[in-house]
C-alpha cells in the first residue's frame, strides 16, 4: 500500500483515482458483438458463448426443480442456518422500507397522491468467477420478492460440468426466485435484456460483474432495459483516529482487497502511529489469507493516507465517495453526520464491512467508482415505481384553471389552454 503524508488539496484527484479500466473501445466492440448475436439467435448463441467462455456444453439453459432439490441436500446444515439468518435480517430491514403513500389536497378540490407498484419482471445476475456469491442472491431476490415482482429471473454461469453452485440455488429458492438459468457474462445480460426461447425478457437488470458485464448492462440500458446502477470494482475506506484498533482496520482493508485484483482499500487517518501499525498488520494478516495473491495485487492500488485533522479527513472522504465507509473514531456518530457521499457506512469498532456484505440486513449492492455522489445502493425502491395520481373536482378546476390558462398561453400551447377552458365553461 502506498503511504501519503499530509496531501495538498490540489493533489486529491490524483490520490483518489480508482484503478484503471480496460480499453473502452475494445470492450465496447466485444460486448456489442455478443449482445447482437444473442439478440438475433437467442438460446443458440447463449449456448455457444457458454461453451466458448465458460468451457461447458449445455443441452438446455434452465435449471430444473430436480437440480434445485439435489442442491439443497448438498448445502451443509451450518451454511443453511447462516443463509436463513441473513435472509431473515435482509427481509426485516427491506420490509421496513415499504412506501405508504398519502393523499394530499394541494388546494381545495385538487387531490394528489402516489402509489408504489412493483416492477413486474426483473433479472438478477449472479457472477461465478473465483467465489460463489450466494449472498448477492439474497440481497437482490429478497427485496424483489417483498416488492411483489411477479417474475424474478436469475442468471449465473455454471461450472465446467454444467452445474450451478448448490448454495446459489438454495439461496434463490429461499428468497423467491421464479426461474434460474445457466448463463454468465455478456450473454446472460443479453438474454435477460432481449429475451430468448428460454429466458424471459425483463424490465430491469440487477447485479454485479466484471468489466464486460458492466459494459453490457450499460449498453442495453441505452434502449432496451433499465439497470440498477453503474458498477465498478469494489472498494472500502476506513476513516480512523488514534483510538482505532489496527488489527480491526487491517482486517477490514483486506476483506475488501480479496474481492478482486482491481478492488481498492483506503485508510484515511489523523494518527501517524495508527498508520504505521496498520501497515504492519496488513502484511501480517495478508500472509495468512487463502486468497492472498488476489489481495496483494489489489493492495498495489490501495493507500494509507495521513491527514492533519478530522475536518480534512471528512472532506477527503466526501470527495472519494466510497462504496463502503467504516468510521472508527472516538466520536463516530458525530463524524457520521458529516458524511454526504458514501454507499453504506459502518459505525464503530465492532461493525465490520463484512456484516453488511452478509447478514446485518442492509444491502451490499452499492454504487462504486465515485457514483455514491449521485446514486443510492439497492433498496426496496429499486424494485418499484411510484405512479402519481390526481383528481380535480369543480371547485378544484376553478381554483387552478385560470393559472393553467395563463401559463399555457405564455408557453404558446393553445391546446393545453383549451383543455382547461372547455371545462371551466361547464362549472
What positions do the PLM features span?
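Flexible, glycine/charged-enriched surface loops at secondary-structure junctions
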Residues: 99-104, 226, 263-268, 288-298, ...
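A glycine- and small/hydrophobic-rich beta-loop-beta segment
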Residues: 259, 267-342
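C-terminal core of ALDH-fold dehydrogenases
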Residues: 319-427
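Conserved small-residue-rich beta-alpha loop and adjacent elements
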Residues: 104-170
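N-terminal Rossmann-like NAD(P)+-binding subdomain of aldehyde/semialdehyde dehydrogenases
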Residues: 1-120
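Short acidic-hydrophobic, aromatic-tinged amphipathic segments that line or gate anion-handling sites
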Residues: 2-7, 179-184, 304-309
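Conserved NAD(P)+-binding/catalytic subdomain of aldehyde/semialdehyde dehydrogenases
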Residues: 176-264
